[in-house]
């Protein structure tokens, strides 16, 4: 889920930045420190939206930098359990498919792709339903539910998000439309 959070921190402004626009300098320092980082409690920081408040700076003996207490807004993405997501399939491998969820990728294990036995076609990089003939491949758009989350502090790479498409109205968007049309025809 995307959120705007208000965060308080202390920013170290080096002496070479004195005399420049303080708000712009603080925002630049915050962007370098936070943007693109993953925090288990906050989520994945996408952008520093605004610097709301900058307190009076204090100079520490022997340092020369000014330390300013600041309050700022940031745009974050934090995956939540049971959240419904839509995303693009960015990779298909023998054990499942990876779906882009904004700044992170989630894995749909082969057992969670569809209610059918499936096989992996390495030439097409696709997962194919044996009875239904349904195909899931790179570039397809899907709707899925988050069923497990393991975020590693500071590391996007070690984080894992597990997804399922084995619930009503989840799956490849084409499959969902076909299911809706079939139900309407039955009525």
From Swiss-Prot:
Enzyme category, top tier: transferase
Any one annotated GO CC term: cytoplasm
Principal subcellular localization: cytoplasm
Limits of the S1 motif domain: 82-166
CDD domains under this entry?
RNAP_E_N, S1_RpoE
Q: Which reaction does it catalyse?
A: RNA(n) + a ribonucleoside 5'-triphosphate = RNA(n+1) + diphosphate
> InterPro entries recorded for this chain?
NA-bd_OB-fold, RNA_pol_Rpb7-like_N_sf, RNAP_E/RPC8, RNApol_Rpo7, Rpb7-like, Rpb7-like_N, S1_domain
Tell me which EC number(s) this protein carries.
2.7.7.6
Q: Name one Pfam family in it.
A: SHS2_Rpb7-N
Keywords associated with the record: Cytoplasm, DNA-directed RNA polymerase, Nucleotidyltransferase, Transcription, Transferase
Highest rank taxon of the organism:
Archaea
**Free-text comment about domains:** Forms 2 domains with an elongated structure; Rpo4 packs into the hinge region between the 2 domains.
Q: Its function?
A: DNA-dependent RNA polymerase (RNAP) catalyzes the transcription of DNA into RNA using the four ribonucleoside triphosphates as substrates.
Q: Which family does the entry's similarity section mention?
A: Belongs to the eukaryotic RPB7/RPC8 RNA polymerase subunit family.
The subunit structure is: Part of the RNA polymerase complex. Forms a stalk with Rpo4 that extends from the main structure.
Protein name listed in UniProt:
DNA-directed RNA polymerase subunit Rpo7
The species this protein belongs to is Methanocaldococcus jannaschii (strain ATCC 43067 / DSM 2661 / JAL-1 / JCM 10045 / NBRC 100440) (Methanococcus jannaschii)
């Amino acid at each position: 889920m995307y959120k705007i959070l208000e965060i308080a921190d202390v920013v170290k402004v080096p002496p070479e930045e004195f005399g420049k626009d303080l708000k712009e300098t603080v925002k630049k320092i915050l962007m370098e420190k936070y943007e693109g980082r993953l925090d288990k409690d906050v989520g994945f920081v996408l952008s520093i939206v605004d610097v709301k408040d900058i307190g009076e700076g204090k100079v520490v003996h022997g340092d020369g930098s000014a330390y300013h207490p600041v309050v700022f807004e940031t745009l974050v993405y934090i995956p939540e359990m049971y959240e419904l997501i839509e995303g693009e399939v960015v990779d298909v491998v023998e054990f499942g498919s990876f779906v882009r969820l904004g700044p992170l990728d989630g894995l749909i294990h082969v057992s969670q792709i569809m209610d059918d036995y499936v096989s992996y076609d390495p030439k097409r990089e696709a997962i194919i339903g044996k009875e239904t003939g349904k195909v899931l491949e790179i570039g397809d758009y899907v709707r899925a539910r988050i069923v497990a989350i393991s975020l590693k502090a500071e590391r996007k790479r070690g984080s894992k998000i597990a997804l399922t498409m084995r619930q009503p109205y989840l799956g490849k968007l084409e499959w969902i439309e076909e299911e809706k049309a079939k139900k309407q025809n039955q009525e």
